[in-house]
Regions:
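Pan-zinc metallopeptidase signature
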Residues: 155-327, 336, 341
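Auxiliary, metal-adjacent structural segments of Zn-dependent hydrolase domains
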Residues: 10-77, 82-87, 107
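Extended low-polarity, hydrophobic cluster-rich segments
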Residues: 97, 255-270, 274, 352, ...
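Extended compositionally biased segments used for macromolecular assembly or nucleic-acid engagement
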Residues: 111-117
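Active-site recognition of the HExxH zinc-binding catalytic motif
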Residues: 91-107, 135
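Non-Sec secretion/translocation targeting segments of pathogen effectors
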Residues: 1-2, 134, 348-362, 368-400
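Post-HExxH zinc-binding segment in Zn-dependent metallohydrolases
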Residues: 117-163
Length: 400
């Protein structure tokens, strides 16, 4: 299919081509910004400027719901929505210029790979993962502050409130666990470092499931946009509209359930695996901090207590592991399961069981978000500690 046919199919109508001076200005700004933001990614500012200045850039009319800018690899061109102010073109060019830097083509100009996305003969893998990673990079370049948003009944904090927000939320979780620099380096240089690191800490099946689920979320969002655009052209009295609205609601429910399922998968697989690898007290503290801070990257829905329950269970298990490691030298560890030997239940363990029962059995009229719940838990622990004069002051910092 020709470029013209592709553009027509997507509803893109070219208005004008940007002149060389404007393209060079955008290329200079973007190349400078990328090199300043990511100094360790082997980006040469002069080489990058020359590369980006070879792009063709156009102003075009675009259908409702389409991204404000789009990169087309077939003719190495960027198309900007005509309602973008000229002084804002650089901002929207960053995401698309990263796509251009990412692309790997064969001798016949067929796209093989773009960052974290693989293009095979029959299917594209990792499109949602790559789009989210690129958007997170663009947000970092632009220094966009975090803000709370709510989409499809999911509330979360993000630096990308308008573009791929749900996908960015999930990929931010991966970046936190594996390392933001690892994610971004693999994204812009189109390599498997991030993928391999994640698989090393989890497994290949989990990576593929996460990758596939993020793609499903992206495709469902795109389908909703297409249906809404079609509804906009129909008579308000058309019976088909009811059917189409029902389909939209089903897609929204699918997006929500897929997001929550993926988030639970990321949480449980990663932290379960890392927990099993803890061999010293320093590892216990690092694990505690990482799991606690992970709450800041999560999306939440009304009535969902998964992370609360998971955190309490892991803190109880972590105390057992702490006690075992404190009393057993690493050299004497024969079987990791030894620390599970039945011990006398501590007051701290009793406390966490009590907190867990509150989360599991209480019937709140209004859902309390994760942060408030854990602030409450911390206060409860401190009060419990002060009242009971627990002989475990060293564990206060361990758990909070």
């Amino acid at each position: 299919m020709s470029v013209e046919s592709d553009l027509k199919k997507d509803g893109i109508e070219v208005i004008k081509k940007l002149d060389t001076l404007r393209v060079n200005s955008i290329a200079r700004t973007v190349s400078n910004s990328l090199c300043e933001t990511f100094p360790d990614f082997n980006l040469n500012q002069n080489d990058l400027f020359i590369k980006l200045s070879r792009l063709d850039m156009y102003i075009a009319k675009m259908p409702e719901g389409m991204a404000e800018a789009n990169y087309f690899y077939k003719n190495t061109s960027i198309y900007f929505n005509d309602h973008i102010a000229d002084e804002d073109l650089e901002e929207f060019a960053i995401h698309e210029c990263i796509h251009y830097i990412q692309e790997i083509k064969d001798k016949r100009n067929y796209l093989l790979r773009m960052g974290l996305c693989d293009y095979t003969e029959f299917r594209i893998y990792g499109l949602g993962l790559n789009e989210a990673a690129v958007q997170l990079m663009a947000s970092k370049v632009l220094a966009i502050p975090k803000e709370y948003v709510k989409y499809f009944n999911i509330t979360f904090e993000t630096t990308s409130p308008s573009y791929y927000p749900l996908e960015c939320c999930l990929v931010s979780q991966l970046a936190y666990l594996i390392g933001e620099d690892v994610l971004f380096e693999s994204t812009i240089n189109s390599n498997d470092t991030f993928k391999n690191k994640f698989i090393e800490l989890t497994n290949a099946k989990t990576f593929m499931n996460i990758e596939d689920n993020i793609d499903k979320i992206l495709m469902s969002e795109e389908e909703i946009i297409k249906i809404n655009n079609k509804i906009a052209t129909m008579d308000d009295n058309s019976k088909k509209i009811d059917v189409m609205n029902k389909k939209i609601e089903n897609l929204k429910s699918h997006i929500t359930s897929t997001f929550i399922k993926t988030q639970k998968l990321i949480t449980s697989i990663y932290f379960d695996n890392v927990f099993d690898s803890i061999t010293d007290l320093e590892g216990v503290e690092k694990y505690r901090q990482k799991l606690y801070n992970f709450k800041d990257y999560l999306g939440s829905t009304a009535g969902d207590t998964f992370f609360n329950d998971y955190y309490v269970n892991k803190m109880m298990a972590l105390e057992e592991k702490y006690n075992y490691l404190e009393n057993t030298s690493v050299e004497n560890v024969v079987d990791d399961s030894m620390y599970l030997t039945k011990k006398k239940t501590s007051k701290l363990l009793d406390f966490f069981n009590f907190i867990k029962s509150l989360f599991v059995h209480s019937d709140f009229e209004n859902s309390v978000d994760i942060v408030k719940k854990w602030s409450f838990s911390r206060l409860m622990y401190q009060n419990f500690y002060n009242l009971q004069c627990l002989n475990s002051g060293n564990l206060l910092s361990l758990f909070f």
